[in-house]
């Protein structure tokens, strides 16, 4: 396992500076370790080697749906994240389409980092300032 520190920094650099600090970085690392150990870029299906579950990227995002407003769709639709995600997609040359974004998370770590950070913007709770609370 190797934490992709540079990719995380580069992904966060695509967002406004106010969205990045040590607490954000620490929480993204904690979530990535929990979800994929920064080893799996798609959801592993137990007992089915090579089969892909519905989640993509180190932070294991599902596509969700417009109706559920969950997963990638939630970040696409939420007023706190939508404009920032549009900018990130434009910068990275990724079409601003929930399915395309979701598919790209498996291979584009900068995009995956930005989407993971933007999801945190949609949460009403503050990012933990103390290291222990991030775990």
Annotate each PLM feature.
Residues 14-22:
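Helix-loop segments that flank and shape redox-cofactor active sites
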Residues 125-132:
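Short, solvent-exposed secondary-structure capping/transition elements
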Residues 22-30, 132-135:
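Alpha-helical scaffolds flanking conserved acidic
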Residues 2-7, 11, 33-125:
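Peptidoglycan-targeting cell-wall enzymes and recognition modules
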